[in-house]
Curated annotation (Swiss-Prot):
Pathway entry: Amino-acid biosynthesis; L-arginine biosynthesis; N(2)-acetyl-L-ornithine from L-glutamate: step 3/4
Gene3D superfamilies cross-referenced by the UniProt entry: Dihydrodipicolinate Reductase, domain 2, NAD(P)-binding Rossmann-like Domain
Function: Catalyzes the NADPH-dependent reduction of N-acetyl-5-glutamyl phosphate to yield N-acetyl-L-glutamate 5-semialdehyde.
Localization annotation: Cytoplasm
Catalytic activity, reaction form: N-acetyl-L-glutamate 5-semialdehyde + phosphate + NADP(+) = N-acetyl-L-glutamyl 5-phosphate + NADPH + H(+)
Gene from which this protein is expressed: argC
Name this polypeptide is given: N-acetyl-gamma-glutamyl-phosphate reductase
Known EC number: 1.2.1.38
Organism from which the protein derives: Lachnospira eligens (strain ATCC 27750 / DSM 3376 / VPI C15-48 / C15-B4)
GO biological process per UniProt: L-arginine biosynthetic process
HAMAP family reported for this sequence: ArgC_type1 (MF_00150)
Keywords: Amino-acid biosynthesis, Arginine biosynthesis, Cytoplasm, NADP, Oxidoreductase
């Protein structure tokens, strides 16, 4: 049985980790860390856990936690994991970090986009970027840190990766339009996220400055063998609880048919349990992935402008956060990737 500790257990992603791990036959949650709710019953914070979780929230003492668990999930704001981790902790346990602290390989890029001084740059090189469908061969029993990808980045990269890797699109022409439910902004109280502020409205935010941009550029840059890739990424907030829909546009680099594009997607995803490439002319919808670890992908060739339109949808709290983290844990401990994640999407 894998003993699990969660730091940041009372955030939305943390609660989703709890929900998923309760159904995992090989995992046991032994530590629910939360600075905001120390000594409070977890089920008082999240009533959906009443009679399911009989434990109190504890502090985020990573050094103590490392002595008690096999893996620590850090579902915390940027900067916290890097400020806590050290050699002694990593000699005792493994860390799956849901923040951005170890996703970017260039510490200067991290500090530029996140406006934070990185507290543990010595661990950046060894951290594995945990996009399982692309990087699973880099995860082994010796891996100490997994950088769980962001929600927008997971959707964007999985939607675009085969097209970039196979040279079907010109990567310099990529434009990504992304829309997310409000849970992506976290559980903290902010005026911008109040009901009256978001209901009956949509807005773009982080235009030209969103912090997931360099993460997408870095990973797609690896796909095309470049370190200078630049693209346009614009996220939008939509009035729903959860879900992300990405629509990406790029110029075609060569003449292709529907069958050519479909074959390229199938080359990478045909055997992937969690990636569903949809039938022709079927567009992804967030409602068909809600509550699940699935990613739905569709595409359309636009011959009038010689562009390819690529679409992807996932649940930002599951495949975009907690579900992918559990998938990474399964990889880390040699379990089937879909253990604890064989959950049908919720509808309605």
């Amino acid at each position: 049985m894998i003993k699990v500790g969660i730091i940041g257990a009372t955030g939305y992603a943390g609660n989703e980790l709890v929900r998923l791990l309760l159904g995992h036959k090989d995992a046991e949650i032994v530590w629910l860390g939360s600075r905001s709710y120390i000594d409070q019953n977890y089920s008082d914070v999240y009533r959906n856990m009443f009679k399911l979780v009989d434990a109190k929230c504890m502090d985020d003492n990573m050094e103590q936690l490392a002595n008690e668990v096999d893996v620590i999930f850090t579902a915390t704001p940027q900067g916290l994991c890097a400020s806590l981790v050290n050699d002694e902790i990593l000699s005792k346990t493994k860390i799956i970090d849901l923040s951005a602290d170890f996703r970017l390989k260039d510490v200067n890029v991290y500090e530029q986009w996140y406006k934070l001084e990185h507290k543990a740059p010595q661990y950046i090189d060894e951290a594995v970027y945990g996009l399982c469908e692309i990087n699973r061969d880099k995860v082994s029993k010796d891996t100490r840190i997994i950088a769980n990808p962001g929600c927008y980045t997971t959707t964007s990269i999985l939607t675009l990766y085969p097209m970039v890797k196979e040279g079907i699109i010109n990567p310099d022409t990529i434009i990504i339009d992304a829309k997310s439910g409000t849970s992506g902004a976290g559980r903290g109280a902010k005026v911008a996220n109040l009901f009256c502020e978001v209901n009956e409205s949509m807005k773009a935010y982080g235009v030209g400055t969103h912090r997931h941009t360099p993460e997408i550029e870095e990973q797609l840059g690896y796909a095309c063998g470049r370190d200078d890739l630049k693209l346009i990424f614009t996220p939008h907030l939509v009035p729903m609880n959860r879900g992300i829909l990405v629509t990406a546009y790029a110029n075609l680099a060569k003449d292709v048919t529907y069958e050519d594009v479909k074959a390229a997607y199938d080359k990478y995803y045909d055997k992937e349990y969690f990636v569903r490439v949809l039938p022709k002319d079927v567009c992804p919808e967030t409602r068909w992935v809600e509550g699940s670890n699935f990613v739905d992908i569709g595409f359309k060739i636009e011959p009038r402008t010689n562009r390819l339109i690529m679409m992807g949808a996932l649940d930002n709290l599951v495949k975009g956060a907690a579900g992918q983290a559990v998938q990474n844990m399964n990889l880390l401990f040699g379990l089937p990737e879909n253990e604890g994640l064989q959950i049908a999407p919720m509808f309605p």
